[in-house]
């Protein structure tokens, strides 16, 4: 069965290796120049606190040069890439057998349908995990200089580093395997599996992820003009009747004095950097659990359903 499965999926394997090679080439070209600029601009010294007054300008110049390239290149495929990759691999696993009738040969041998599917799933799922881990490693290396400045929690870093990218691909793959079994067509199965995967992906990111752990709170009290006015906003207000308090001042008014008198300050809600792997583990666990449910359902349905006509 190993040789048969290799012959069936070697085209996908070669295509995935080609995709990985393309990502690696792009990463090497862009990241090499990024790393050179990072070192030549003296940013390691800035991060160590010994770069002097030139650091803000140097950091801004670096992010202006490479930040947009990093962000645009990955943001354009951030949401759909793992899902597309997973469904393209998963949908034909059973759907193609049912669509072209090759199940008649595959399932008439001495190997049971359940064992046939279990072996295919073990091999292909293992390949999916290896592919996801390899892409994650390449992108993590590629983004390393920018991550030292921005951290790992921004979306286009968080979603491609750590554990979640592999979990995203695995979940989409599992959905596509199940849907391919149900509707018996590869291309429609890709579409039908991708839509719920994307919906879950968005819900987890924007609804659940911010609440995996309660954020820490940092309050910056006004102690100087810099800390006070740095958080004060300017704008227009409509006519006000009655007493005007310290919350609104003329452009030439003593804003700092008013803020100090009112004991005002800035409150920051944040997730510390050392929670990155905790967040990654929670989110990856959600998608791996969904993948396990989908694959378990596919095995159960294939075992119980009658042979297709």
How should these model regions be labeled?
Residues 86-90, 134, 175, 294, ...:
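Hydrophobic/aromatic residues in alpha-helical transmembrane segments
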Residues 21-29, 122-184, 188, 201-216, ...:
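Secretory targeting signals
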Residues 1-21:
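Aromatic- and glycine-rich beta-strand/loop motifs that create alpha-glucan
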Residues 10-14, 78-81, 113-140:
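Selective transmembrane-helix segments that form parts of the transport pathway or gating/packing helices
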Residues 72-98, 102:
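Long, hydrophobic alpha-helical segments
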Residues 71-75, 84-88, 157-161, 279, ...:
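Short alpha-helical transmembrane interface motifs in multi-pass membrane proteins
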Residues 93-125, 302:
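Helix-loop-helix units of permease transmembrane domains in multi-pass membrane transporters
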Residues 26-66, 152, 198-301, 305-308:
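Terminal transmembrane helical anchor/hairpin motif
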């Amino acid at each position: 069965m190993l040789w048969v499965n290799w012959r069936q999926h070697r085209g996908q394997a070669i295509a995935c290796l080609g995709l990985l090679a393309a990502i690696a080439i792009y990463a090497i070209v862009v990241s090499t120049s990024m790393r050179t600029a990072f070192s030549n601009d003296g940013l390691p010294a800035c991060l160590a606190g010994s770069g002097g007054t030139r650091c803000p300008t140097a950091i801004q110049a670096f992010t202006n040069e490479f930040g947009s390239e990093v962000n645009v290149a990955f943001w354009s495929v951030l949401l759909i890439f793992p899902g597309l990759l997973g469904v393209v691999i998963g949908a034909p696993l059973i759907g193609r057998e049912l669509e072209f009738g090759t199940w008649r040969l595959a399932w008439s041998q001495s190997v049971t349908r359940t064992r046939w599917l279990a072996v295919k799933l073990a091999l292909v799922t293992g390949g999916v995990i290896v592919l996801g881990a390899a892409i994650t490693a390449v992108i993590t290396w590629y983004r390393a200089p920018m991550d030292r400045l921005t951290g790992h929690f921004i979306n286009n870093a968080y979603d491609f580093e750590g554990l979640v990218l592999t979990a995203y691909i695995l979940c989409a793959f599992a959905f596509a395997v199940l849907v391919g079994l149900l509707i018996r067509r590869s291309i429609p199965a890709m579409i039908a599996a991708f839509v719920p995967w994307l919906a879950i992906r968005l819900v987890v990111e924007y609804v659940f992820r911010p609440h995996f752990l309660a954020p820490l709170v940092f309050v910056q009290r006004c102690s100087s003009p810099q800390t006070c006015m740095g958080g004060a906003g300017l704008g227009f207000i409509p006519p006000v009747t009655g007493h005007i308090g310290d919350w609104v001042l003329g452009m030439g008014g003593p804003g700092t004095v008013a803020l100090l008198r009112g004991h005002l300050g800035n409150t920051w809600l944040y997730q510390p950097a050392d929670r990155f792997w905790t967040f990654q583990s929670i989110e990856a666990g959600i998608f791996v659990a969904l993948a396990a449910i989908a694959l378990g359902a596919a095995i159960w349905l294939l075992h119980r359903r009658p042979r297709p006509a």
